[in-house]
Amino acid sequence: MFNCAVTAIDLTPMPLLSTDNMTTAPLSLSTDTSLIEKSLFGIPEWLLQINDDISRALERGVNIRQLVSARACVIDDLLIGLFKWFELDKTDLALFATGGYGRGELSLHSDIDILLLMPHEIDADTSSKIDNLVALLWDIGLEPALSVRSVSECLEAALDHTIASALLEARLLIGNETLQDVPHQIVNNQWSPRAFYDVKIDEAKARYLQHNATEYNLEPNIKTAPGGLRDIHIVGWVTKRYFRVSKLYDLVQQNFLTEKEFDELSFSEGYLWQIRHYLHELTGRNENKLLFDYQREIAQLMGYDTQPDDQPNAAVERFMRDYYRCAMQISTLSEMLTNHYYETIIEPQLPDEERPKKQPINARFNQVGEQIAMAHHRVFAQHPESILEMFLLMGQYGIKNVRTHTLRALKIAARGIDQAYRDNPTHQTLFLANLKEQNYLFHRLRTMNRYGVLGNYIPAFAQVTGLMQYDLFHRYTVDAHTLFLIRILHRFIDPHFYEDFPLVSSIFQRIERKEILVLAAMFHDIAKGRGGNHSQLGEIESIEFCLAHGMSNADANLVGWLTRYHLLMSMTAQKKDISDPEVVTLFADLVGNVTHLNHLYVLTVADMNATNPQLWNSWRATLMKQLYSQTRRILRADIDAPTNRQDMISATRKQALMMLDNVDNQHMNRDEVLSLWDDLGDEYFLREIAEDILWHTEAILNHPPIGRASNADSPPLVVLREHRELALDAVQVFVYTQDQVNLFAVTMAVFDQMNLDVLDARIITATRDFALDSYVLLDRSGTLLVDSDSQQELKQRLIDAFKNPTAPKLTHKRIPRQLKHFDVETTINFEFNDASSQHIMSLETLDQPGLLARVGQVFLQQQIEVHAARITTLGERAEDMFYISDQNDQALSANKLKTLKTALIESLSVHNDSI
């Protein structure tokens, strides 16, 4: 039984209900509820007051461990009192606390798991009393998770490993003391150590997959996610089954757990309990998911104050960094300790043929089955270089894992990596050799990171461990993102992934010094969180590291250049018009040579894939490939390649004609095709690819009277097709109609009304004032691709809107929950394009429902003509570009630009304030 220490924590005494007042006969709720209500008056309010007392005690600095134990004791006393009230203590029943409550751990709104155990079948009278007890518990607001079982029923139920886990935590509160050890005996009878270990490990693996197998989710579940409380519980479950202990600290006395490991687990558990307390307090329920809704407030409650020089998100980012570090420590210890249990308890009991065989690698290391192990316990102390040598051997021998006694020694040895260690030429050679060895590189670096080797060898890497940017775009911490990037680089030499990355894979396989890219990956984000330009700061740090490790100036400078310009290619491809030869030429000038281009292309594709799983798609892949190919032609001075505007137009027309000749084109006359193309204008062939040109051409020519004689009375043409290569629910929409001033605004309003997100937009005006608008959309409802009625509705809505071009009607939708917690300042900039006499307007603002419809409405009000748009959504940020002019295709005046900017900011600000 726990010591509640009520006086020390100053909890409010229980009102009226006490065992001293229970001398009268127990009352049935169904016969005399008035006396019961009088006796139990105030208990719901008392329970709320207890929660308030606990919260105030936490504010005063009382240890959270005391508080979760104190609340468990309070509930103990209440349940014991009620058990007596209903005279259940005069039966053969035993009342057990199980699960977390059995461990004596209750947060404000934790589940109260209880078991009523009977040696035989429960009679009707006892069953009635139990029903009354349960009803009362619900009436006073406890909402218990109650199981009522006989011993035989419990035996059968324990075949479910989740119930067996709860029984392992069973703690007798009151009742039949002869049943005190029965729950544990049942588990021991029903489960062998090996079977129970296997099922709990399988459960943990399944649980990890539900949370993307990472500790670094943006809104982590602090109970069930990797690195959550469940990872501590699993250590207790598998070990308690064997050692028959009740507390985690008992494992220290069993020499299974070291004092330091216990302290680390205990501290991390307390940190999560504190977060959990505030989650329960803020939500008023058993909430374990650390949503954006609560992260800022919990950071403040836990003392993460914003400093005068801080960025707006600094405090919450510090809080989440500490959470992620805590989660990584828990998951690492949990994995190590469960493996240690297998190696020391399960493995020795296996038949000889199933036990891993030991084979010497050298004087310092052995291979034990599929693991590496030090040959004796003094290896790291006597041979410090063996820390890095071990990881190199793992790559050379194809060994993925490390024995736990070696991991324990490694963790201690890693603390001794200091500047003298880093300056040792032998150690430097071994570290670079590790990066050159591609076999299991990700897994080796991951182990280095988790056990302190990487952070001590590269101190700057330790600074970004657990560092998360508070946004929806960056899905992982900097260290996790960096290691994922290196993992993706390795996939470029894996035949299984060649189909996903054909061009990148072929380029990467031709690069001889692959460690150049690995080093660039290691350093590309290493200066985040310091303030200033992280790319430039990282360049300096990477060059210093490479030179200190004996690399040539050329190699060091290439690593530095890649670190500095790692965002250049993705930003150019996504934010600029790469159909413009001047844009590509400027990019080529910055890149300088094909070697730089090849390395940058590979690094950029890997970086985008490792940043956010939703970021990479065939649309972005096409943009990147297009920019790479065009730049490579310029850098190679390919005289046959189109390098100027007219050459690119001619090349696209030629490619489209070749495709036309290779398909069934009986519905298209070649002369009519060429005549139509002459009407479409040069801009069209600069911006569209040959495949889409062929699709558009066939649609136009087979839609009379547009195809043969376009005129002002021609009906609008709207055609759709799926674009699954881009995304599962992607739809391509092509519009060909008489140009009009509000076409963009009307189109965006219709898309918004039908819950369609715009990924890309190309707005082109043909020579005869016909608009050729092409859009790539994402269907939020997922029905447009499969529902012909929805397709027809979209077509008809657009056609009706084009025929009746009144001011578009905007919808008012609630902003998604996650977006509400981000403050993105709206910024608008203009750049004049001499070649087109148009302004390029860049808009950065909070992504929100109906954003483009609102922008289109402002364009309509300000009499702005849209010629092209590039739509980019990066998490919570919308970063869009529009090529605009006045309605006479003339450049906008300075006053007009100022008015437009003011109108846009005002429109978007009003909308943001209202949702």
Curated annotation (Swiss-Prot):
Residue segments, region Uridylyl-removing: 361-731
Domain notes: Has four distinct domains: an N-terminal nucleotidyltransferase (NT) domain responsible for UTase activity, a central HD domain that encodes UR activity, and two C-terminal ACT domains that seem to have a role in glutamine sensing.
Top-level division of the source organism's lineage: Bacteria
Region feature Uridylyltransferase, mapped onto this chain: 1-360
Record's protein name: Bifunctional uridylyltransferase/uridylyl-removing enzyme
Stretches assigned to the HD domain: 478-594
Keywords for this protein: Hydrolase, Magnesium, Multifunctional enzyme, Nucleotidyltransferase, Repeat, Transferase
Enzyme Commission (EC) number: 2.7.7.59, 3.1.4.-
Span of domain ACT: 732-817, 840-915
GO biological process, one term: regulation of nitrogen utilization
Swiss-Prot/TrEMBL cofactor(s): Mg(2+)
NCBIfam families according to UniProt: UTase_glnD
Organism for this UniProt entry: Psychrobacter arcticus (strain DSM 17307 / VKM B-2377 / 273-4)
InterPro entries registered for this protein in UniProt: ACT-like_dom_sf, ACT_dom, HD/PDEase_dom, HD_domain, NT_sf, PII_UdlTrfase/GS_AdlTrfase, Polymerase_NTP_transf_dom, UTase/UR
SMART domains found in the cross-reference section: HDc
Primary gene name: glnD
Activity regulation remarks: Uridylyltransferase (UTase) activity is inhibited by glutamine, while glutamine activates uridylyl-removing (UR) activity.
Protein task: Modifies, by uridylylation and deuridylylation, the PII regulatory proteins (GlnB and homologs), in response to the nitrogen status of the cell that GlnD senses through the glutamine level. Under low glutamine levels, catalyzes the conversion of the PII proteins and UTP to PII-UMP and PPi, while under higher glutamine levels, GlnD hydrolyzes PII-UMP to PII and UMP (deuridylylation). Thus, controls uridylylation state and activity of the PII proteins, and plays an important role in the regulation of nitrogen assimilation and metabolism.
Intrachain disulfide bonds: none
Any Pfam family hit: NTP_transf_2
Family under the similarity heading: Belongs to the GlnD family.
